[in-house]
Amino acid sequence: MAGTGLVAGEVVVDALPYFDQGYEAPGVREAAAALVEEETRRYRPTKNYLSYLTAPDYSAFETDIMRNEFERLAARQPIELLSMKRYELPAPSSGQKNDITAWQECVNNSMAQLEHQAVRIENLELMSQHGCNAWKVYNENLVHMIEHAQKELQKLRKHIQDLNWQRKNMQLTAGSKLREMESNWVSLVSKNYEIERTIVQLENEIYQIKQQHGEANKENIRQDF
């Protein structure tokens, strides 16, 4: 329920879910759903109700490779197979048996393949020597990250629990005050009713006494004459 003395956009929520009762009573859920349905019928957003927002840039994080893949998928083209030509050692064709340039290219290709394999062997040797320790360090870092994340999670859960307890205590305290004030209001209303009824009775008695005195005065005057 919105307050009348609030700044535009501010809302005061007067619900006390930890204190209020009767949510499971028959018809309550249907009444709430009817209120929601009524509000949704009143809210008619226009087609450009998000016009105040900047236009989204869906391609902000796209790379050329991603863009090419999206275009390939849109065109329903098959993915290109991995080329294994660089790992082959073809000899010069029959027409190039006496071509020195062709043979030089084959030799260069063989040297590149050999160097590539040598680098792979060196990488395997380095991995065999240092890979185990590097993997252990990596796992230790992961463990520390998990422990830190779990501690943060526990802090958040405790904060949420404390907040819920605080909300519950505040609502129960407010509910008790409201119940006490309601009881006082009922008592005051009852007392006011009793006072008003007593006043009416006294006014009637005063009126009757005045009438009796008036009739007695008339009777005395009549007797005097």
Swiss-Prot record:
Record's keyword annotation contains Coiled coil: yes
Record's subcellular location: Nucleus; Nucleus, Nucleolus
Keyword Coiled coil included in the entry's annotation: yes
Keywords: Acetylation, Coiled coil, mRNA processing, mRNA splicing, Nucleus, Phosphoprotein, Spliceosome
Principal localisation: nucleus
Top-level taxonomic group: Eukaryota
Modified residues (Phosphoserine): 94
Gene Ontology cellular-component terms listed: catalytic step 2 spliceosome; centrosome; nuclear speck; nucleolus; nucleoplasm; nucleus; Prp19 complex; spliceosomal complex
Biological process per Gene Ontology, one example term: ovarian follicle development
Transmembrane segments: none
Modified residues (N-acetylalanine): 2
Tissue expression notes: Ubiquitously expressed.
Coiled-coil blocks: 138-222
Pfam families: BCAS2
Assembly and binders: Component of the pre-catalytic and catalytic spliceosome complexes. Component of the postcatalytic spliceosome P complex. Component of the PRP19-CDC5L splicing complex composed of a core complex comprising a homotetramer of PRPF19, CDC5L, PLRG1 and BCAS2, and at least three less stably associated proteins CTNNBL1, CWC15 and HSPA8. Interacts directly in the complex with PRPF19, CDC5L and PLRG1.
Family under the similarity heading: Belongs to the SPF27 family.
Role summary: Required for pre-mRNA splicing as component of the activated spliceosome. Component of the PRP19-CDC5L complex that forms an integral part of the spliceosome and is required for activating pre-mRNA splicing. May have a scaffolding role in the spliceosome assembly as it contacts all other components of the core complex. The PRP19-CDC5L complex may also play a role in the response to DNA damage (DDR).
Protein name as catalogued: Pre-mRNA-splicing factor SPF27
Taxonomic lineage of the native organism: Eukaryota, Metazoa, Chordata, Craniata, Vertebrata
